């Protein structure tokens, strides 16, 4: 699975000056905002432009009514009270038939599950949620004899349906199986999980598509099943659908036949063994384009007929990366075909269903005339990510969700190798620093982080671990591991692992064993210290080559021994170091409590670079004199260090300063050379690193203008060099968008003037905006010169355009307006799926929170509408759980109190338990940070000539 893009590709965002002064009691804040939103809606609703064409209508159909065939029960007399399924009940095959009643927003189905029993029982239980059993289940012995059913009931606490037989069920042996048959029905609307329907426009007509999304625990919403990843089975799937539709599933079509004049039945080939979360089927009226892999496998991309051209790039990148992975893993793709399909409203970024990968449109469809280079890279990365899963995740699946990183960390790591193979000039092997390593090091330096391998025991806990630790930290430690044991032995170890556990389940220890076999190195001993405890170390260098380690935490007052770890927050660190152009690795044993000395041959003032290219998942702190030397070296000739090293210096220094391990004056000195910096990697990290300071001081009327003036000067030379013409290489276009966006953010008049001029020309219809400048022009043009007419025009363009990537940019532009009445109206539009798709609700809230005028409004809107959001998305929705992190920039005691009060009012956090911990910790740290650091930072900026 790939995350939806909750945040823009750039961490920094528009934050102008606040013009409102908060006054009055705290209680009044919520009331005022609530009233302003309501009054604005009632006064302004008539000015919202009508769609240029009738939008797809949201269904008002009700879910199927419970017929009480298997009524609810709180009976806890059996093992079904446990969260995990029992080991003695194991499915081996599903015969699944589903009928999609597209016009009625519902479906019916029948499933027969072949089950092995390793011990006698009278009770069978399996997962179900929301879907209803419509007929008493039927159970047959291996002989075919029917077993009388005493009763069935739903045990909703653990999302089970329990079937109790009237007779003993003996253990099975060999190929003998029990056959459990259940008829069921479900609702096709109401959410973006399970089997659901969404709509789109085609030539002015409303069209429908229905598809599944099952990871991690939503297959049980589509059909009754043993919904755990280690309950692998084969599947024979049939879909009955209106004759004008077609059907897809994991496997190729076996046959298609008319049931009657209106209905067609499509039957698919029996599958290989796979987990329930990978089962997929779709009912559609799309068209496909096709490529063939080098091994002869058909690779198809299904899209709306009028979007066919936008699927070409995805088809091409699929072919190139697919062939690369078949070679790299030395294992042919296991299924006869691989399809991809773009779903018009899709909750996550993409889902790796075996043989039928589903995508959000922004992550699959690319128009070279309308999409930005960043969009192209996003498509390539997500396609590669999902292709990795066809091996890591699908062929070999983690045994339980505590080892989710075996799926997601691996996909996040290998996606960069795959795209690097296909797009060799994109610097993808360095961009992993920007996308994964640096961001997750910030997350993992909080006390509220969690280990890579983490115990999960509820659906909410399972969905919550689909986070940066599983994805990005997983990728980061694999990058370090590959460097330590060498890429060749790492590749061999992956091949051993895939072959040994093909069509089966594995644990983290199994992967370590495979790599040890390939490398003859103590992989488990080293790597368990990185996966079984949270956090990471800072390596402190003294005397140029003596190093010690300790846990790195952003909160300098936190107890580094908490929560308790058997390893005591010490790590076995593969320390790469370079002297005189020679690079070596020394494994720093965690038991060396006094530190170690690197065997370097240093002469004169030679510099020993620890962690070159930030290859290891740790930070490095040098002595003050060494940091001064680095700053001087950057100013005199920054190219003596690689772009990755320059990024690493900056990221480490600002993180160390934030943790009070380094004076901010030293960190800020590293930015003095930036007038000479022309590379993408360092600038991206500078912008991200200083964004924290910018965010903390945006309301400081004395200090913020100093910050603006300084960074305007630092960015201007490269901004002038790049200009406003959309030309150059892929990397140059990414750099230009970042640099000009940062110049606008820092209030550069020339940059804002150019953005406004392009925006105004676009409003007048006299000129189009260059594709790679559109996002920043929509944002800063709207901020700088946007009014109600401009906002309405932008909304009209959002409703007219069919390209999802363009829609996303326009959503950000709408969120950048200064007019709070328009922002209030925008927030209320989130309740209308005819205007804002369900998939985009949390994206828009986040965009509004990046606007200084919308930050508090967005947070208060969430509080006022929490019951509505929970009702619409459920408390276990990971995106609802994470939306509270929009409060991370808050830095006052009042704001902290408001957050604590809100969380106390709604104590059931569901999938948001960990995000709540993280945002509270962050805001507390922000308050302390301001008290400690404002003076030294002010002195540094005030001392500038």
Swiss-Prot record:
Major subcellular location class: membrane
EC numbers on record: 3.4.11.7
Cofactor note: Binds 1 zinc ion per subunit.
Name of the protein: Glutamyl aminopeptidase
Top class in the EC scheme: hydrolase
Topological domain spans for side Extracellular: 40-945
Bilayer topology annotation: Single-pass type II membrane protein
């Amino acid at each position: 699975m790939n995350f939806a893009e909750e945040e823009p590709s750039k961490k920094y965002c528009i934050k102008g000056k606040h013009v409102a002064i908060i006054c009055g009691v705290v209680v009044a804040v919520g009331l005022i905002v609530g009233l302003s939103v309501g009054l604005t809606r009632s006064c302004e609703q008539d000015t919202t432009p009508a769609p240029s064409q009738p939008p797809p209508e949201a269904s008002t159909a009700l879910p199927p009514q419970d017929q009480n065939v298997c009524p609810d029960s709180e009976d806890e007399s059996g093992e079904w009270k446990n969260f995990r399924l029992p080991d003695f009940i194991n499915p081996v095959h599903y015969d699944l038939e589903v009928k999609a009643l597209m016009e009625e927003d519902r479906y019916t189905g029948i499933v027969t599950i072949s089950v092995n029993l390793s011990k006698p029982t009278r009770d069978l239980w399996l997962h179900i949620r929301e879907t209803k059993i419509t007929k008493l289940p039927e159970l047959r012995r291996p002989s075919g004899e029917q077993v009388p059913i005493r009763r069935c009931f739903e045990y909703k606490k653990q999302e089970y349906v329990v079937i109790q037989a009237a007779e003993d069920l003996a253990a099975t042996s060999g190929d003998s199986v029990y056959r459990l048959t259940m008829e069921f029905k479900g609702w096709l609307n109401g959410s973006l999980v399970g089997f659901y329907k969404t709509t789109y426009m085609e030539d002015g007509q409303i069209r429908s598509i229905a598809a599944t999304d099952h990871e991690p625990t939503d297959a049980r919403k589509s059909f009754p099943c043993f919904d755990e990843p280690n309950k692998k089975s084969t599947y024979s799937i049939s879909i009955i659908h209106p004759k004008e539709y077609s059907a897809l599933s994991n496997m190729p079509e076996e046959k298609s036949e008319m049931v009657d004049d209106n209905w067609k039945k499509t039957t698919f080939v029996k599958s290989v063994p796979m987990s329930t979360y990978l089962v997929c089927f779709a009912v559609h009226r799309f068209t496909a384009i096709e490529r063939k892999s080098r091994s002869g496998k058909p690779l198809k991309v299904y899209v709306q007929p009028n979007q066919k051209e936008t699927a070409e790039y995805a088809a091409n990148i699929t072919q190139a990366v697919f062939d690369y992975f078949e070679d790299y893993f030395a294992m042919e793709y296991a299924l006869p075909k691989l399809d991809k399909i773009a779903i018009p409203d899709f909750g996550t970024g993409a889902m790796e269903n075996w043989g039928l990968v589903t995508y959000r449109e922004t992550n699959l469809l690319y128009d070279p005339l309308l999409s930005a280079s960043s969009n192209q890279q996003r498509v390539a990365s997500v396609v590669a990510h999902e292709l990795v899963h066809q091996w890591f995740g699908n062929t070999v699946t983690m045994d339980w969700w505590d080892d989710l990183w075996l799926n997601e960390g691996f996909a996040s790591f290998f996606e960069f190798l795959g795209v690097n193979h296909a797009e060799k000039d994109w610097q993808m092997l360095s961009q992993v620093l920007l996308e994964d390593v640096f961001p997750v090091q910030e997350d993992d330096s909080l006390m509220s982080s969690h280990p890579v391998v983490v115990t999960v025991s509820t659906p909410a806990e399972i969905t919550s671990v689909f986070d940066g630790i599983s994805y990005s930290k997983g990728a980061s430690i694999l990058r370090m591991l590959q460097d330590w044991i060498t890429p060749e032995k790492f590749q061999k170890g992956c091949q051993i692992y895939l072959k040994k556990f093909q069509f089966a389940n594995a644990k983290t220890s199994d992967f370590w064993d495979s790599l040890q076999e390939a490398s003859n190195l103590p992989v488990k001993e080293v790597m368990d210290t990185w996966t079984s405890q949270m956090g990471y170390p800072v390596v402190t260098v003294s005397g140029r080559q003596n190093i010690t380690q300790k846990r790195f935490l952003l909160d300098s007052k936190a107890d580094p021994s908490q929560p308790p770890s058997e390893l005591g927050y010490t790590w076995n660190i593969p320390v790469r170091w370079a002297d005189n152009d020679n690079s070596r690795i020394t494994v720093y044993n965690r038991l060396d409590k006094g530190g170690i000395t690197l065997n370097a041959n240093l002469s004169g003032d030679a510099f020993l670079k620890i962690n070159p290219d930030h290859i290891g998942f740790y930070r490095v702190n040098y002595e003050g004199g060494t940091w001064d030397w680095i700053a001087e070296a950057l100013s005199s000739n920054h190219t003596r260090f690689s772009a990755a090293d320059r990024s690493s210096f900056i990221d480490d220094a600002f993180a160390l300063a934030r943790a009070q391990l380094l004076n901010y004056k030293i960190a800020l000195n590293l930015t003095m050379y930036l007038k000479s910096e022309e590379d993408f990697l360092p600038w991206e990290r500078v912008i991200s690193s200083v964004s924290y300071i910018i965010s903390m001081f945006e309301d400081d009327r004395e200090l913020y203008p100093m910050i603006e003036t300084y960074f305007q000067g630092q960015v201007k030379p490269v901004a002038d060099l790049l200009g406003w013409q959309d030309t150059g290489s892929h990397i140059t276009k990414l750099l230009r968008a970042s640099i000009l966006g940062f110049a606008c953010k820092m209030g550069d008049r020339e940059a804002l003037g150019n953005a406004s001029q392009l925006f105004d020309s676009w409003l007048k219809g006299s000129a189009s905006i260059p594709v790679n400048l559109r996002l920043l022009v929509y944002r800063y043009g709207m901020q700088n010169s946007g009014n109600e007419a401009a906002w309405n025009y932008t909304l009209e363009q959002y409703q007219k355009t069919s390209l999802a990537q363009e829609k996303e940019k326009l959503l950000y532009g709408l969120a950048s307006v200064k007019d709070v009445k328009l922002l209030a109206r925008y927030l209320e539009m989130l309740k209308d799926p005819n205007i804002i798709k369900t998939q985009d609700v949390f994206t828009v809230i986040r965009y509004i929170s990046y606007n200084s005028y919308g930050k508090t409004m967005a947070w208060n809107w969430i509080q006022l509408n929490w019951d509505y959001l929970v009702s619409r998305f459920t408390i276990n929705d990971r995106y609802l759980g994470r939306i509270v992190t929009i409060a991370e920039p808050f830095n006052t005691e009042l704001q902290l109190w408001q957050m604590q009060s809100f969380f106390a009012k709604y104590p059931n956090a569901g999938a948001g338990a960990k995000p709540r911990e993280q945002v509270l910790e962050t805001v507390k740290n922000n308050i302390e940070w301001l008290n400690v650091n404002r003076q030294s930072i002010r002195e540094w900026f005030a001392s500038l000539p």
